[in-house]
């Protein structure tokens, strides 16, 4: 009986050790976190519910910059290796044209308009010219087949940008790339409850990602988790030092117990 009990205890200790290794965040100094800590970030720019300023449009980013908000934005790579700011993998919801954005050239994308307005899908360079360091940026990398090219070309653009930029992604392989090649950028693991991952993620993978058990790949310094219940593993990673970022807030009340807030459809103060 004693041997059996000892074996159970040893097994539990080993499992706890493996879990702790898997979820442990990366290290970052207070100075590295400071530009992003305690800030509100306009989700895809300060877009409007009436559609006059579509998400991820130059108008939405200009409005956010004029107030001084941080912004969260999404980057994709086009068929001709241009870095554009757009959220969905498919163009249809925002442009009415079906097709994956990575299969279109920039010239083809320039023919499209966002949500029936005169706004085009912007280049990352155009967005950065609008923001010009007015507030910090959380830059979300969308997963794609050409992850390496997306990361390399985006970093080449960011090299001379004078403002504060951190990166995040649902794809831990992108964080792993940054950990290895561009460790100077603060890294964030995007996550949500396992049952909310789409068909592209198997149940085991969704479980691992939703519980941040993939942190060992990219060692994120912050976790951007969907507002709602957080699994024990996520709270443990936060207790180990990961910054707490929530998305997507639609209420002032969401600032409680968070270090930064990604928001939309209301106007908070600049700081938590």
Q: Across the structure, where does each feature detected by a protein language model lie?
A:
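Phosphate-group recognition and catalysis centered on beta-loop-alpha active-site segments
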Residues: 2-272
């Amino acid at each position: 009986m004693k041997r059996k009990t000892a074996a159970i205890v040893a097994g539990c200790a080993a499992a706890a050790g493996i879990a702790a290794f898997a979820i442990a965040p990366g290290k970052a100094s207070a100075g590295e976190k400071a530009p992003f800590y305690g800030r509100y970030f306009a989700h895809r720019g300060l877009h409007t519910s009436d559609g006059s300023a579509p998400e991820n449009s130059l108008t939405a980013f200009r409005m956010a910059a004029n107030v001084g908000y941080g912004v969260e934005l999404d980057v994709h790579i086009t068929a001709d290796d241009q870095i554009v700011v757009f959220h969905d993998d498919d163009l249809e919801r925002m442009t009415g044209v079906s097709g994956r954005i990575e299969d279109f050239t920039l010239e083809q994308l320039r023919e499209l308009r966002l949500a029936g307005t005169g706004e085009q899908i912007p280049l990352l360079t155009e967005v950065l010219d609008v923001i010009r360091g007015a507030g910090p940026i959380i830059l979300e990398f969308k997963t794609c087949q050409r992850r390496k090219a997306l990361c390399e070309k985006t970093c080449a653009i960011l090299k001379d940008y004078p403002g504060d930029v951190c990166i995040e992604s649902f794809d831990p392989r992108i964080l792993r790339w940054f950990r290895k090649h561009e460790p100077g950028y603060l890294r964030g693991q995007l996550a949500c409850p396992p049952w909310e991952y789409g068909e592209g993620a198997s149940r085991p993978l969704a479980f691992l990602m939703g519980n941040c058990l993939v942190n060992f790949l990219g060692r994120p310094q912050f976790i951007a988790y969907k507002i709602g219940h957080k699994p024990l593993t996520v709270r443990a990673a936060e207790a180990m030092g990961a910054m707490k970022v929530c998305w997507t807030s639609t209420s002032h009340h969401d600032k409680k117990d968070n270090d930064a807030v990604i928001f939309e459809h209301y106007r908070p103060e600049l700081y938590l």
